[in-house]
C-alpha cells in the first residue's frame, strides 16, 4: 500500500498543498500512506484522506474507490476526506465544510493599475530577502498573529509547527520583506516541491511596519521563484473569507478546485463483515 517512490510521486504531482507529504507529516505528525491513487495520513485511529487522485484531481470514481479502501483499514475510528466532491460513503451525519482553491498561472497575468501602485509603494520601503532560515523575528510575527487573532485550534497548531515544516521540506522557501534597518515587515512561505504547481502557503505582516502592498510584494517574490523554476501554476490556497478571497482575486486568481471536507466516525465492523473481507482477501 505504501512505498517511498509512490509518496514521492504524490509530492511531485501535487495539485493541493495537502498532497505535499513533508508538509503534512511535519505539521500533523502523522504517517503518510498511499490509498489507491490518493495520499492519506494516519494517526492512531484517525485518517485524513486527501481525495484528489494524482492522475486527475476531480475524478469522483477514483475518490470513491479510495474511500472504500480506506474504510477497510483495521482500527479505523474516524475518517476525514477532502476532495473535489463529497464522497458517497459520507453519512448524513458527517461534518462537512466547503471552500475553493484559487490559482494563478505562472507567469502571472499583468497586474492591474491599483496593484502595480501597491507593489511600487512597497518596493520603495522594503527589500526582499529569500531563504530557508527561520529567524526570531519570523517567530515573533507569528506569535503576534496568534495573540491578536481569533483562530481555529487547527490553524493555531499549524502556525506553531511552521519551523518544523520549513526544516523538513526542502521545497519550502521564506520570502521576507525587510525595511532598510533590517526590521521584518512581512513574510510569506512558499512550497516548490511539486513539478508544475507552486504553493502560496502562509503570509504574515506587521501592521506597524508594513507599508500598503507588503503582502503583495512578498507574494510577487514567490511568483518570481516559481517562474524561475519553470512551474506553470501557483495554488494560492482556499478563499477562507471575503478579505482573503479578494486578495487572491486582485491578482487575477481564478477558482481552481472545489474543496469539500467530510468527517465522520467509522462504526466497527461486525463479525460477518470482517469474515467476508477476510475471505475476499484470501481469494484475491
Labelled PLM ranges:
Residues 171-273:
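Aromatic (often tryptophan-rich) hydrophobic motifs at membrane interfaces
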Residues 69-70, 165, 221, 225:
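A generic secondary-structure signal
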Residues 72-85, 226-237:
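Conserved GNAT acetyl-CoA-binding A-motif
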Amino acid at each position: 500500500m505504501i512505498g517511498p517512490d509512490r509518496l514521492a510521486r504524490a509530492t511531485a504531482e501535487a495539485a493541493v498543498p495537502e498532497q505535499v507529504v513533508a508538509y503534512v507529516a511535519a505539521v500533523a505528525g502523522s504517517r503518510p500512506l498511499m490509498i489507491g491513487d490518493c495520499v492519506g495520513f494516519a494517526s492512531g485511529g484517525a485518517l485524513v484522506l486527501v481525495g484528489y487522485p494524482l492522475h486527475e484531481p476531480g475524478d469522483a470514481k477514483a475518490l470513491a474507490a479510495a474511500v472504500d479502501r480506506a474504510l477497510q483499514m483495521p482500527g479505523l475510528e474516524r475518517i476525514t476526506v477532502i476532495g473535489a466532491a463529497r464522497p458517497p460513503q459520507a453519512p448524513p451525519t458527517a461534518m462537512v465544510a466547503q471552500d475553493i482553491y484559487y490559482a494563478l498561472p505562472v507567469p502571472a497575468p499583468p497586474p492591474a493599475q491599483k496593484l502595480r501602485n501597491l507593489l511600487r509603494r512597497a518596493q520603495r520601503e522594503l527589500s526582499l530577502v529569500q531563504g530557508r532560515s527561520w529567524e526570531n523575528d519570523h517567530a515573533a510575527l507569528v506569535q503576534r498573529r496568534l495573540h491578536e487573532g481569533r483562530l481555529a485550534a487547527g490553524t493555531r497548531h499549524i502556525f506553531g509547527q511552521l519551523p518544523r515544516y520549513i526544516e523538513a521540506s526542502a521545497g519550502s522557501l521564506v520570502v521576507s520583506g525587510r525595511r532598510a534597518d533590517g526590521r521584518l515587515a512581512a513574510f510569506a512561505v512558499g512550497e516548490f516541491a511539486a513539478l508544475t504547481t507552486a504553493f502560496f502557503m502562509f503570509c504574515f505582516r506587521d501592521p506597524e511596519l508594513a507599508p500598503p502592498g507588503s503582502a503583495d510584494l512578498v507574494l510577487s517574490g514567490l511568483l518570481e521563484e516559481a517562474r524561475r523554476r519553470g512551474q506553470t501554476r501557483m495554488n494560492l490556497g482556499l478563499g477562507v473569507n471575503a478579505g482573503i478571497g479578494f486578495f487572491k482575486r486582485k491578482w487575477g486568481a481564478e477558482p481552481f478546485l472545489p474543496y469539500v471536507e467530510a468527517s465522520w466516525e467509522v462504526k466497527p465492523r461486525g463479525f460477518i463483515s470482517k469474515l467476508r473481507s477476510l475471505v475476499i482477501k484470501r481469494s484475491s
